[in-house]
A protein has these predicted regions:
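N-terminal, polar/charged subdomain of small-to-medium soluble alpha/beta proteins
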Residues: 1-130
Length: 130
């Protein structure tokens, strides 16, 4: 069984992208996260210390998006997942990163990457190569 805390539509201005102009000019990025965990004890105790503080989640994501540099939003999503899985006792985390303005030579509303990770993914051999 899995409960969820969902934080949607976080917006940041950052300098990620494949193209040099994206990294120089910057652009808007949007992030959603779903934190899968058992929330029964927090609900029964009505105590934030038994849950996850949304401010802390937002702050951690803001630091990653605004202070680190990535060429791919896939890499940005992975970094967010790793930090959240390391910081909290989660069953899983879903991370969505959207890039509303994509320089691909056509009209596109946005591009989004969605990843799902579990604590086992932190210990996987593929992750050790990153």
């Amino acid at each position: 069984m899995s409960d969820r805390i969902v934080v949607r539509d976080m917006e940041f201005y950052a300098y990620h992208g494949v193209f040099e102009a994206e990294r120089e000019i910057g652009q808007r990025f949007e992030v959603d996260v779903e934190l899968h965990l058992d929330l029964r004890s927090a609900a029964q105790a009505d105590d934030i210390d038994q849950s996850i503080n949304y401010v802390d989640v937002y702050t951690a994501i803001k630091e990653i998006v605004e202070e680190q540099e990535f060429r791919l939003i896939e890499s940005l999503a992975e970094a967010i997942a790793e930090v959240l899985l390391s910081a909290y006792d989660l069953e899983a985390v879903v991370v969505r990163v959207r890039k509303p303005s994509v320089p691909i030579g056509g009209i596109v509303g946005e591009v989004e990457v969605e990843i799902t990770r579990t604590p086992a993914d932190l210990r996987s051999p593929a992750n050790e190569e990153l």
